[in-house]
A protein has these predicted regions:
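N-terminal, positively charged/glycine-rich alpha-helical extensions of SAM-dependent methyltransferases
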Residues: 1-51
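Conserved alpha-helix/loop element of class I SAM-dependent methyltransferases that forms part
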Residues: 33, 38-74, 89, 93
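A short acidic, Gly/Pro-enriched loop at the edge of an enzyme's catalytic core
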Residues: 139-149
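A short glycine-rich, Lys/Arg-flanked "PGG" loop and its adjoining helix->strand segment in the class I
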Residues: 162-174
């Protein structure tokens, strides 16, 4: 039985139509050819890092109710990390705040991963681990558990969105 059966029961009807393997393959080719969002790592020296949902203050307040000790290392997963916006922002916030923790980037696109890695390197960040894989493979990768998971704009692209949510929940730390 899934850890969060109610969540899965609520979303499963919305994802009853699954994409075909051919559609999934075309989508993978698209993101390999056109990594999203378009970013140039040479711009990192002048690029602002703003946004949501991976803003450290928002995570502290909205996810942990401002009750999580800041001295406790934060393990975060950015699933479907694309060209690295969420990864760069959260890793930079942790580093600037002198907070312990690490960010795990996961995306199936080698092209997007290459851009994300170059952006992280351009900023001199050392608190990011990169993995090229589908988030559907998370339970087999042995990467968790994570205190926080960011998966924005990804599930609807999967051949099995409910399975994707189940995979994310499987690596989320208790509590």
């Amino acid at each position: 039985m899934p850890k969060y059966p109610l969540v899965l029961d609520c979303i499963a009807p919305h994802y009853a139509r699954r994409m075909t393997d051919a559609t999934d393959a075309r989508l993978a080719e698209q993101y390999e050819a056109y990594p999203y969002p378009q970013r140039d790592p040479r711009d990192e020296a002048k690029r602002l890092i703003i946004g949501s949902p991976s803003h450290l203050r928002e995570i502290d307040f909205w996810v942990f109710g401002a009750a999580r000790p800041r001295s406790r290392p934060l393990r975060a997963l950015i699933a479907g990390g694309g060209t690295g916006d969420g990864t760069v922002m959260l890793a930079q916030h942790l580093a600037r705040a002198g907070r312990p923790g690490d960010v795990t980037y996961l995306d199936r696109s080698a092209a997007a991963l290459g851009i994300a890695r170059a952006r992280v390197e351009a900023r001199g960040l050392s608190n990011v681990a990169f993995h090229q894989a589908s988030l559907l493979d998370l339970p087999r990768l042995g990467l968790g558990p994570f205190d926080y998971v960011d998966c924005c704009g990804v599930l609807h692209h999967l051949p099995d969105p409910a399975g994707g949510l189940a995979a994310l929940l499987s690596v989320l730390a208790p509590g």
